[in-house]
Design a protein with these regions (language model features):
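Extended, charged low-complexity segments
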Residues: 137-204
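A glycine-rich, acidic short-motif signal
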Residues: 44-133
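Residues at alpha-helix termini
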Residues: 15, 19, 112-115
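N-terminal low-complexity or amphipathic/hydrophobic leaders
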Residues: 13, 18, 25-66
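Glycine-centered secondary-structure boundary/capping sites
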Residues: 2, 20, 40, 116, ...
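C-terminal alpha-helical interaction appendages
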Residues: 1-17
Length: 204
């Protein structure tokens, strides 16, 4: 199905809220996913998979010289943290022992206007962001893999280009809608007595 950038961004945002993710994270993730979809990359299915496999745990972070090492991480938590560390320009390398979505990490780099943002799997370049442009190796399909971020200049032969339409798989859209509906308050005696329209304050 075809949708607009705003429609998709709102759906991802509401799906995140429905998954009990903080508002600030939902804002960043929804923008990153919608931006990647503008370029024809299947980020919506990717974020749905991430939402369904949420696990809340303490960050396992090691700082060694100018390197930060995360353990097994999720892009919506450790990925955002890693990007924040990268933007300080204090560290030469950010390493994830395992990251669930390198693609969405690239999207986060893109919307945050980072420069010389080089993402590698082992020694292979899989993505690069610089000056509001990005390259993504579409032959790379790995998830839950070791990832490192380095601030290094790289000469890209061709950056990804914007597509004319955003096309989303109908099943992915439906699954995201189901998550987004979790933000609706179920009808109950409590909600009728104390919710909007209960005449508790002057605005009801």
């Amino acid at each position: 199905m075809i949708c607009s950038y705003t429609e998709l961004k709102n759906l991802i945002y509401n799906s995140g809220i429905g998954s009990n993710i903080d508002v600030g994270i939902c804002e960043e993730i929804s923008e990153a996913v919608a931006k990647l979809e503008l370029y024809g990359l299947n980020a919506s299915a990717e974020i749905y998979r991430c939402f369904k496999k949420l696990s809340y745990k303490k960050d396992n972070i090691k700082i060694i010289d100018k390197s930060i090492q995360f353990g097994k991480g999720m892009v919506i938590f450790e990925g955002i943290s890693g990007l924040d560390y990268f933007r300080t320009n204090l560290y030469d390398e950010i390493i994830f022992e395992e990251l669930d979505s390198p693609l969405i990490l690239i999207g986060l780099g893109l919307i945050n206007n980072v420069e010389n943002f080089k993402v590698l799997n082992s020694t292979s370049l899989i993505g690069y962001v610089d000056k509001k442009k990005f390259f993504w190796n579409e032959n790379f399909t790995g998830n839950n893999v070791k990832i490192s971020i380095k601030k290094e200049k790289f000469k890209v032969q061709q950056f990804n280009s914007v597509k004319s339409k955003i096309k989303i798989d109908k099943n992915v859209w439906k699954n995201l809608e189901l998550l987004s509906r979790k933000i609706l308050v179920p009808e109950s005696n409590l909600s009728r007595d104390f919710g909007a329209g209960a005449n508790i304050n002057d605005n009801d």
